[in-house]
């Protein structure tokens, strides 16, 4: 059966040690001009906050929503995504930043079990303003020994585990040399 092509970003599914999956709080600068969607990879920036992470950049973690005071209504607001250019001084991002969290993510091409322990970069920065979900995927064409994420298995999801067809889901962890907490140098 063909896999469902429905990218959803990076979804935390378990912890390598059996521990709890937790989020930590980080700032997003007021008026940051790029939307960040739930399930989208983010990077740490020198100013102490987080921003959207592109292919090849060092990953801090995966965005899990945000909280801010709405600049129009002055009401406290929890949002599944960060609306670009929000002018609030109290924006808090919730980030799954533990490098031992296993995420489920969709391949943009044909991902196979033979690719386990290969590294991949991410692709895409878009998402839905209705659901707040990211549409990031693994860039199947970047399968190498390095990359932002390491595939550790193929998903058990019956709708997206056919490795003979495009868009199979994979289980991934952040690659050691591509995660902020595992670097030996500062940002």
Segments from the language model and where they lie:
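Surface-exposed, low-hydrophobicity beta-strand/loop segments enriched in small/polar/acidic residues
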Residues: 1-187
């Amino acid at each position: 059966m063909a896999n469902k092509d429905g990218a959803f970003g990076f979804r935390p599914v378990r912890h390598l040690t059996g521990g709890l999956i937790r989020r930590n709080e980080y700032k997003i600068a007021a008026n940051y001009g790029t939307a960040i969607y739930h399930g989208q990879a983010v990077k740490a920036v020198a100013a102490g906050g987080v921003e959207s992470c592109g292919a090849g950049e060092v990953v801090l973690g995966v965005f899990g929503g945000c909280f801010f005071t709405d600049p129009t209504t002055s009401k406290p607001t929890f949002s599944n995504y960060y609306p670009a250019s929000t002018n609030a001084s109290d924006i808090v991002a919730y980030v799954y930043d533990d490098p031992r969290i296993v995420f489920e993510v969709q391949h943009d091409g044909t991902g196979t079990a033979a690719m386990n322990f290969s590294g991949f970069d991410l692709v895409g920065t878009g998402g839905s303003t209705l659901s707040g979900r990211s549409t990031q995927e693994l860039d199947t064409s970047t399968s190498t020994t390095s990359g932002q994420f390491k595939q550790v298995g193929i998903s058990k999801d019956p709708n997206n585990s056919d490795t003979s067809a495009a868009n199979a889901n994979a289980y991934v962890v952040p690659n050691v040399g591509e995660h902020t907490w595992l670097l030996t140098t500062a940002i």
